[in-house]
Amino acid sequence: LVASNITVNTSKNTVLNGAIFTDYTIDSTGKSSRLDLALTDNSTWNMTQNASAKNLWQGSEAEGNFVTDLSLNNSVIKFGHLDWNNDNELLEAQKAENFKNLYVAGNYSGDNGQLHMNVVLGKDDSATDKMIVGGDTSGTTYINFKNIGGSGAQTAQGIKVIEVLGNS
């Protein structure tokens, strides 16, 4: 294992499709890999799936898309779509276990950024796409939710779609 550092800066109307995975395993020198992602000028990341590999996140194994630092400047992340059958029911393969997770180990900044997320509007523990930021957040980001079959319900704590472990 060799730690590497990658920075991806997109420009006008760039489209990324798929999953992103950064291995945070610490190598023999005490370093881990970094992937800094900056989406700018109407760029889009279509997060079509969770990365198939699992990573350690806050001491526990987690499955999802992993980046180190993330910034959205007039750009959008679309947390994929869920498929329905002809009876307006979720296909079995598209149920709660297939919602997307985005882990940002470091900091997140938004400058007119957008997140398009899927959520079942129901109780506190409703299935949802999630974004978890290990560091700090700053700026302005708009979140668009698509209700995936939820009929609404009383919540005590709300449905957690974004969690920030640092300052916000």
Which residue ranges define each predicted feature?
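Extracellular beta-solenoid/beta-roll
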Residues: 1-140, 146-147, 151-168
